[in-house]
Amino acid sequence: MKGGKRTQKAADKNRINEQITGVDEVRLIGTDGEQAGVVSINEALDAAAEAGVDLVEMSPNAEPPVCRLMDYGKFLFEKSKEQKEQKKKQKQIQVKEVKFRPGTDEGDYQVKLRNLRRFLEGGDKTKVTIRFRGREMAHQELGIELLNRVKNDLEEISIVESFPRRAEGRQMIMVLAPNKK
């Protein structure tokens, strides 16, 4: 679809100056934030021109619509700056995966446990996957034991979000989330 973004942005924008049509009166707010009361649209446009600022429609659905005298360019700049700041503050939570086998030896287990601990302390969720091959499917209890061992080793820094009752296909998956500090 061509031009989809433009139409979406047009809906976000406030109407300014001569774009405000279809109304006779507006509730006017001055540059200092004080209410000037209900005035005709022409008086509001004259006041904006006199002050050297724009007449910006803040809430078009109100009766009468609320308009404010302000520098629209500065308003847009502040708004985009605020949105960027909020986006920076949001932390993207990732799900990291560590794979085990039912016969994982002690050395490998400790390395994988260290990685899990590092991911959880970094604030990421972790997915612990136990993969079964061939005849290992007959010994699913080994997978459950391994998941319980991981759960117990990490219980002071994590909470279990989901724990498998049985194997899904040829694997068991447990999801751990970091403790809230």
Swiss-Prot record:
Signal peptide: none annotated. It comes from the Bacteria. GO terms for cellular component: cytosol; membrane. Its main location: cytoplasm. Keywords: Cytoplasm, Initiation factor, Protein biosynthesis. GO terms for biological process: ribosome disassembly. The keyword Cytoplasm applies. Monomer. IF-3 binds to the 30S ribosomal subunit and shifts the equilibrium between 70S ribosomes and their 50S and 30S subunits in favor of the free subunits, thus enhancing the availability of 30S subunits on which protein synthesis initiation begins. This is Translation initiation factor IF-3. The lineage of its organism: Bacteria, Pseudomonadati, Pseudomonadota, Gammaproteobacteria, Alteromonadales.
